[in-house]
Amino acid sequence: EAPKINTEERTIWDERTMLAALQTIENPALHLAVHLSMILSLREGEILGLQPGDLDFDAADGRGTITVNKAMQRADKVALSKIDPSQIYHIFPDQREGSSSALVLKKPKTKKSSRTLYLTRPLKEELLAWLEKLRQDELAMDGRYRNCGQLFRLPNGMPVAPEALSKWYRTWR
């Protein structure tokens, strides 16, 4: 007989609890990521796979939509060489020389994972403010900004890695 796994049932937060939690997050990138996760039930890789072109603020009679059709993950370079290239959109340049892994933008695991979701007004406003912040970051870097094309970027324009987002989340929690 297989060993039994103890699983803890997660508590579903009501709107008040969710809003209270969001108010405690000071990191703007983490705030947006948690907001996307709470409202749209997006996973970490889906959040980091988002690009500005996935946002349509005029769709749904101005309510706005977000299309989820990519995921970001860190992959071992040896394993990466064995993956079907049609599943990979982009391999980001190494940030550390000699790294054995790479950040990869890839297709989601299943066709059902690709979907278009409606935005709430507060989420739409936060996304618009975030895009403005990215524009300001680029201007502040005075030609040194390296726009990776992702919605979640570091102030220098490079992508936020899943392990960075996880670390921010653990620090907040």
Describe the residue ranges of each PLM region.
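Intrinsically disordered, low-complexity segments enriched in polar/charged residues with Gly/Pro
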Residues: 1, 41, 103-105, 138-139
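Short, solvent-exposed polar/charged micro-motifs at secondary-structure junctions
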Residues: 3-9, 128, 159-165
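Basic, Lys/Arg- and aromatic-enriched nucleic-acid-binding interface segment
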Residues: 1-52, 60-63, 112-113, 125, ...
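Short amphipathic alpha-helical segments at helix-loop
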Residues: 6, 107, 111, 152-154
